[in-house]
Structure formats: C-alpha cells, structure tokens
Amino acid sequence: MNNSVDKVLTYTIHEVAPYINWIYFFHAWGFQPKEKERAKAAEAMQLFKEANQMLNQLDKNYHVHIIFRLCEANADGDNLILDGKLFPLLRQQIPHPDGSPFLCLSDFVRPLSSGIPDTVGIFAASCDGEVELLYENDTYKRMLVQTLADRLAEAATEKMHE
C-alpha cells in the first residue's frame, strides 16, 4: 500500500551556499589542502573568490530543487521493497582486508519476515538544468559552474536534513 507523498523543495542559491562542502569542491579542481604550498594556496584562494562571485551571479536566476519521499519499506534478502515495489541491490563487491562482511543497503532496513514495516527516505537534488549549459564557449567558467552545481545539489541535501 502506497501512502507516500512526494515533497518538492526549492531553494535559492544563497540559501544553500553556506552548506557547500568546499573540500570536495577543491578536490574536483585538483587542490589538496597543504599549507606548505603557498603558490597552490594562492591559486585556491583565487578560485574560491571566483566561485563565490559565480554563486552571486547564479543566485539571480537559478535555484536548487529537491524531491523526496518517505516510503514504507522492508528488506527481503538483498532487495528493498519500497511502497510495494521491489528494488534489487548489490552487496559490496571488494573484499575487506579485515574480513568484515559484505554489506548491502538492505542490511539496514527491517526484514519483511518481521511483519513490521520500516521507513526509508529517498531523494534527488539538482540545480536548474540550464545551469549546465552556461558558458558553452568558456571552458573555465563552464567547469566552474558545473562544479558549483554539483556542490549546490549536495548542499541542498544538507539543508533539507535540518
């Protein structure tokens, strides 16, 4: 039985910008946090400044959207049953050096055999699609916008969890 309702959230860029994980932003650009490399640090600071300027520009016309749902759920072996629909999942595939078990998302949901339903939240986040098309003739700005769009989608999920 499906009693779930999709909920859509829309945020402005400035609402989610404080939640940006800048470490991953810099990793995407090939910067590793090392204080001793002053030249790299200066480059990173310039990139940070330009990223914030771009956020201010994007805030004028674009938003970040999230759709989420809380679903009735149970695990059936390696499968999840969400609102009555079966979703096959995989277990971890790479052996652990310590011999720990191969985990699957279904391991964290109440089993169907318990007869008691559990709840699982699912969501997707994205910036307005047109953002990815900006600056087609400027490789640097295009990459900057795309990297920011990834981080903004992630930031919106952090805000959603408040």
Predicted features and spans:
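Active-site loops and adjacent core secondary-structure elements that bind or stabilize anionic groups
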Residues: 1-143, 147
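C-terminal substrate/ligand-recognition segments
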Residues: 141-161
